[in-house]
């Protein structure tokens, strides 16, 4: 469904991702680990097509369509959705207006909105607030998840859904996401993996030193990270090989 081929990305002339290869088949949810500042959010921005994230080389494929140079709105139309870690504040735009746009004007639109807000424990008055203005950490997460659920994308990217959230909201959001992701495809980004207490991921990857250093079973990789931190990933033969190949190519 989503395939990245040797993707290299720059921001303001600085290389932030290099030769990233990743493939997420239809119906699978993958998790991407990585230390702070490793480029996890940058990868999401590049996949979405934000212009400041310039693709230097490589390809992005979605459902066998080359979307490398496609505008953001066209990618969204194809079914790519995202829940940001730190969404922007938009004054004058009500959360409820955004949700109504996503849901549409069908005969069951009102009922669906009520069902979604009830599922996320969102009071009706919350919808009348300016988008993300003065929202707490838990409110931001629920607002982002509400928007994603309203859009019903075929492929969803979740940027640190477990950051800045208390235990109660984490459990609520986690269980809702796990149910929503059944039968869908997605990329879940996390630093410490708390969200994985509630969400099942088919495969895990580690982003380190601008590239994906290793991939494998989610439980195994998470266990290593929790025990040894990301120092464990430095021992990965795949990462060492890629670093060696990079040094050789730079010398040529």
Model-identified regions with their sequence ranges:
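Conserved structural motif at the start of ABC-family nucleotide-binding domains
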Residues: 2-4, 17-19
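The feature captures the beta-strand-to-loop junction immediately N-terminal to the Walker
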Residues: 33-38
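Helix-to-loop junction immediately C-terminal to a conserved catalytic motif
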Residues: 48
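ABC ATPase NBD coupling module
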Residues: 54-55, 66-81, 180, 225
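Q-loop/switch helix immediately C-terminal to the Walker
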Residues: 85-86, 92-109
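ABC ATPase C-loop
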Residues: 148-149
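Walker B catalytic motif
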Residues: 160-161
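Conserved beta-strand-loop-alpha-helix hinge in the C-terminal portion
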Residues: 211-234
């Amino acid at each position: 469904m989503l395939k990245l081929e040797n993707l290299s990305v720059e921001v303001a002339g600085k290389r932030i991702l290099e030769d990233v290869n990743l493939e997420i088949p239809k119906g699978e949810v993958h998790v991407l680990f990585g230390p702070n500042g490793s480029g996890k959010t940058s990868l999401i921005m590049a996949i979405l097509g934000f212009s400041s994230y310039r693709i230097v080389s490589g390809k992005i494929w979605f459902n066998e369509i080359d979307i490398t140079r496609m505008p953001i709105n066209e990618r969204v139309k194809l079914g790519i959705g995202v829940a940001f870690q730190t969404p922007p504040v938009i004054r004058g735009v009500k959360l409820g207006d955004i949700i109504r746009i996503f849901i549409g004007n069908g005969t069951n639109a009102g009922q669906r909105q009520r069902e979604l807000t009830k599922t996320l424990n969102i009071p009706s008055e919350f919808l009348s607030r300016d988008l993300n203005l003065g929202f707490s950490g838990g409110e931001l997460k629920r607002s982002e998840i509400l928007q994603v659920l309203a859009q019903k994308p075929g492929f969803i990217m979740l940027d640190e859904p477990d950051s800045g959230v208390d235990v109660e909201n984490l459990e609520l959001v986690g269980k809702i996401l796990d149910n929503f992701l059944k039968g869908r495809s997605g990329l879940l980004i996390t630093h410490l993996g708390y969200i994985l207490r509630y969400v099942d991921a088919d495969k895990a990857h580690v982003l380190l030193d601008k590239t994906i250093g290793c991939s494998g079973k989610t439980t195994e990789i998470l266990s290593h990270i929790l025990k040894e931190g990301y120092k464990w990933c430095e021992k990965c033969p795949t990462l060492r090989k890629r670093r060696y190949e990079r040094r050789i190519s730079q010398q040529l």
